[in-house]
């Protein structure tokens, strides 16, 4: 496998820390050891997160093309668009963000606080669009790029989650390589890695990276899209493409992509009771915050799988904390009493 042949522009602090979740593990019976790899602490650029790791491989391409404007898309409380805005500010580039109405959640401040507030503060041109949730290529995004061209600019397209970008899976191939180095220092290997999946390239990159040592199917995706067939297809497609890019040396199969579909409801962006219990439990036992759109659902999945005995006794499970906490203020009504 050869990731090193791709240029990488450093946007992160370096390897993200692995933190033992001792109190949560003990609360759940102590038979499974839980750890978190803190991608939410990976950068000083507007709270960072998993997209910042991905963007390290997109930025060299944008600079090589002479682009002057990063154009991306997400929901109103998109972590992706906030991270793109931060990178644009860091590089001295312009930024256009399409923010669609992906979540059926009504709150007077939903489009004024959290991620979208930070994007505006960083100087992004934020464009609210009424279109609903979809993880594919969007007309509104293509129209935004055309508007940049018509104004004399040179846009660089960054799709939702970086996922449909040809290089979108590379960052999390690097994640797997980083984990292997940390495992050597820790003196053990993780039996499972739990990760939230929606647009797919985070899990896809992990699948490829861990396939290099036979652990592709030990990456347990927790669907938060509530459109699992679409997400599974996209993860698989991106993983196959990424495997070819890095010369993995073996094909990615359907069996390599594990996606647990039990925790996404009621729909994208809306938490269920299990999501909320997981968010509060993790906060109160570990002081680690998760959000109701993504990480709360993957945390719910991990906790429930431990409770059901789906991880063998003695297993060491690594939870990939991808970020998302800046969106919490947009859900303040839900958490008004903690």
UniProtKB/Swiss-Prot annotation:
Q: Which SUPFAM superfamilies match?
A: Tryptophan synthase beta subunit-like PLP-dependent enzymes
What Pfam families does this protein's entry cite?
PALP
Which Gene3D superfamilies does the UniProt record give?
3.40.50.1100
Keywords assigned by UniProt, alphabetized? Hydrolase, Pyridoxal phosphate
Q: Name one GO molecular function term.
A: 1-aminocyclopropane-1-carboxylate deaminase activity
Where do the catalytic residues lie?
A: 78
Taxonomy, superkingdom: Bacteria
Return the InterPro entries for the record: ACCD_DCysDesulf, ACP_carboxylate_deaminase, ACP_carboxylate_deaminase_bac, TrpB-like_PALP, TrpB-like_PALP_sf
Q: Which reaction does it catalyse?
A: 1-aminocyclopropane-1-carboxylate + H2O = 2-oxobutanoate + NH4(+)
Identify the HAMAP family for this entry: ACC_deaminase
Q: Which family does it belong to?
A: Belongs to the ACC deaminase/D-cysteine desulfhydrase family.
This chain's function reads: Catalyzes a cyclopropane ring-opening reaction, the irreversible conversion of 1-aminocyclopropane-1-carboxylate (ACC) to ammonia and alpha-ketobutyrate. Allows growth on ACC as a nitrogen source.
| Name of the protein this chain belongs to | 1-aminocyclopropane-1-carboxylate deaminase
Species in which this protein is naturally found? Burkholderia ambifaria (strain ATCC BAA-244 / DSM 16087 / CCUG 44356 / LMG 19182 / AMMD)
Q: What is the lineage of its organism?
A: Bacteria, Pseudomonadati, Pseudomonadota, Betaproteobacteria, Burkholderiales
Gene encoding it? acdS
């Amino acid at each position: 496998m050869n990731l090193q042949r791709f240029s990488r522009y450093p946007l992160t602090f370096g390897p993200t820390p692995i933190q033992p979740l001792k109190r949560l593990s003990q609360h759940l019976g102590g038979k499974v050891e839980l750890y978190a790899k803190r991608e939410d602490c990976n950068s000083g650029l507007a709270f960072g997160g998993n997209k910042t790791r991905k963007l390290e491989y997109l930025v060299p391409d944008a600079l090589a093309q002479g682009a002057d404007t990063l154009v991306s898309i997400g929901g109103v409380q998109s972590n992706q668009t906030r991270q793109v805005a931060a990178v644009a500010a860091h590089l001295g580039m312009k930024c256009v963000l399409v923010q669609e109405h992906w979540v059926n959640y009504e709150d007077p401040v939903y489009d004024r606080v959290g991620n979208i507030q930070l994007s505006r503060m960083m100087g992004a041109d934020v464009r609210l669009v009424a279109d609903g949730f979809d993880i594919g290529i969007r007309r509104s995004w293509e129209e935004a790029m055309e508007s940049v061209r018509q104004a004399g600019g040179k846009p660089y397209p960054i799709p939702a989650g970086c996922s449909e970008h040809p290089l979108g899976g590379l960052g999390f191939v690097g994640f797997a390589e980083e984990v292997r180095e940390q495992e050597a220092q820790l003196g053990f290997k993780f039996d499972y890695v739990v990760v939230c999946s929606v647009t797919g390239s985070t899990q896809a990159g992990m699948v490829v990276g861990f396939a290099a040592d036979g652990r592709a199917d030990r990456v347990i995706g927790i669907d938060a899209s509530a459109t699992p067939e679409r997400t599974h297809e996209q993860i698989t497609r991106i993983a196959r493409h990424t495997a070819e890019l890095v010369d993995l040396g073996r094909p990615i199969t359907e069996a390599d992509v594990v996606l647990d579909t039990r925790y996404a409801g009621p729909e994208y962006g809306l938490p269920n009771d299990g999501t909320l219990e997981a968010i509060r439990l993790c906060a109160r036992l570990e002081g680690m915050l998760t959000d109701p759109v993504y990480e709360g659902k993957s945390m719910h999945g991990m906790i429930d799988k431990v409770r059901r005995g789906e991880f063998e006794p003695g297993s060491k499970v690594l939870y990939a904390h991808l970020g998302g906490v800046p969106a919490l203020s947009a859900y303040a009504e839900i958490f008004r009493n903690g």
